[in-house]
């Protein structure tokens, strides 16, 4: 009898989809690296520190759909921009106050806040699946709908210090330091979250990283 054993082992191949590397990522479902996403931008799920066209996840300073200073996003946010709320202004909120239904403002949010979030997807420091520090999908600290830091390519949203619904320190529904909230929060506290903590469902993040 003749036994033939044949193996082909390729130890130098990496065909991964879910992993990241420090500084770049061409991912589908997972997260981003500290400095960049898929070539500085991605149309999937990842984010990078400087720009992203993402859908789901977030990284330090950027969010699922946003990046620091500019974003053409749909859902999520990044450091300095958010899909729903921002530092000092929000779709329905402003600095320290909100008449929110779903989202929040600086330090608190029904969905997210600076350092805390009640997120569903994933979050990062200063950004959330719905909000981020300094800008929002409807508002931003200087820009909104698809905001960038200080400028925006908005549709019905806001710009620096003012918003379609809100403005810095005041809002279409709220004003500085006060709110007519329903189930959400105010400065430093949240219906779901508080400053530095979160009541998340899906994944959570930590300073500069996310739990995807």
From Swiss-Prot:
Residues 58-69, 124-154 have a biased composition (Polar residues). Residues 32-53, 78-119, 158-201 have a biased composition (Low complexity). It is found in: Secreted, Cell wall. Sequence repeats lie at residues 20-27, 32-39, 47-54, 58-65, 66-73, 77-84, 85-92, 93-100, 104-111, 112-119, 123-130, 131-138, 139-146, 147-154, 158-165, 166-173, 174-181, 185-192, 193-200, 205-212. Residues 20-212 are annotated as: 20 X 8 AA approximate tandem repeats of D-S-Y-G-S-S-N-[DT]. GO terms for biological process: cellular response to oxidative stress; cellular response to starvation; cellular response to stress; filamentous growth; filamentous growth of a population of unicellular organisms in response to biotic stimulus; filamentous growth of a population of unicellular organisms in response to starvation. Keywords: Cell wall, Repeat, Secreted, Stress response. Its main location: secreted. Disruption phenotype: leads to reduced flocculation stimulated by 3-aminotriazole-induced amino acid starvation. Residues 1-212 are annotated as: Disordered. It comes from the Eukaryota. One of its GO terms (cellular component) is hyphal cell wall. The keyword Secreted applies. Coiled coil: none annotated. The keyword Secreted applies. Induction: Expression is induced during filamentation, biofilm formation, after UV exposure, as well as by benomyl, caspofungin, and ketoconazole. Also enriched in azole-resistant strains and in stationary phase. Expression is repressed by SKO1, HOG1, RFX2, farnesol, and in alkaline conditions. Expression is also controlled by the filamentous growth regulators CPH1, CPH2, and EFG1. Residues 1-20 have a biased composition (Basic and acidic residues). Cell surface protein involved in the ability to sense and respond to changes in the host environment. Required for stress response and confers partial antifungal drug resistance. Contributes to the DNA damage response. Required for the flocculation response stimulated by 3-aminotriazole-induced amino acid starvation. Belongs to the DDR48 family. This is Stress protein DDR48.
